[in-house]
Amino acid sequence: MSVTLQRTEANGDGASPFVELDRQTWSRLAAQMEQPLNEEDIFRLRGLGDPLDMKEVREVYLPLSRLLHLYVEASHQLHAATTTFLGEQTQRTPFVIGVAGSVAVGKSTIARVLREMLRRWPGTPNVELITTDGFLYPLAELKRRHLLERKGFPESYDRRGLLRFVSEVKGGAEEVRAPWYSHVTYDIVPGKEVVVRRPDVLIVEGLNVLAPARPRMDGKQGLAVSDFFDFSIYVDAKTSYIEEWYVDRFRKLRTTAFAQPESYFHRYATLSDDDAESTARGIWKRINEPNLEENVLPTRGRAQLVLTKDADHSIRRMLLRKV
């Protein structure tokens, strides 16, 4: 099997901490595996504007789910060896996977597909997915802090709440609760929560989940959410591709989410094609692209696996950190 190494100029010897695999090489890793999802599953998991199909699942996500299952099994073996060494019987904690990437890059679809596929592997029937949207400050609080135009930037999140949530899950808490976010009202839903009860695997999906810890007020380094990840994935693509995907999704939302009377963006439902494109590109240039360049893209090198997409949303390259 042919495997090439990604070269970097950061190291004098030209070595890289990543192994680079092209689509063809990666797909061969699942040649003998049975496809666990059917067309109905894929239709249900597909995101708006994301042309996920059976071929993509078989060639990309099937080998990825197998790789993740190997990591989960290895963590179980390490837990058993550690408890034997310590002479103490401690309960195994959930395996936590982080999925990061830009708005509109398709990370939510990838997270949903991985959840469904990992549920079908032996040993991990209970797989939960949490998005960091639930840890955005409520709209009223964002307005009070003058952060509405910075929604999605690191400062718009309750980072302490997110860190506490992941820490408690990783610590083995029987039940952990998170706020519920509505993409229709664009706000936290009062009185509604996401409840996670000791899953085998927890997938945490969001823009900034790979961000490093910020220095504390006392000058000491704090903890980052990614400190609790057992595996992390960054979904990558050219910025120009992501912009087009964002604009395309915005157009389609006019007849779906935006069309609902209770939608925060209901005013956009009647925009013409030209006005919709102009509005979407304005939002992209003003908010999403700066956030990508300043906060999201710089975390790419912190991931254990980088999935690079082509203009048609298909994964064309994988960079896997060497063990």
UniProtKB/Swiss-Prot annotation:
Class of the enzyme per the UniProt entry, highest EC level: transferase
Residues forming coiled coils: none
EC numbers on record: 2.7.1.33
Gene3D superfamilies in the record: P-loop containing nucleotide triphosphate hydrolases
The reaction(s) this protein catalyses: (R)-pantothenate + ATP = (R)-4'-phosphopantothenate + ADP + H(+)
Localization of this protein: Cytoplasm
Highest taxon of source: Bacteria
The UniProt record lists the keyword Repeat: no
List of residues binding ATP: G101, S102, V103, A104, V105, G106, K107, S108
CC annotations in GO: cytoplasm
InterPro entries: P-loop_NTPase, PanK, PRK/URK
An MF annotation (GO) of this entry: pantothenate kinase activity
Family: Belongs to the prokaryotic pantothenate kinase family.
Identification of the protein by name: Pantothenate kinase
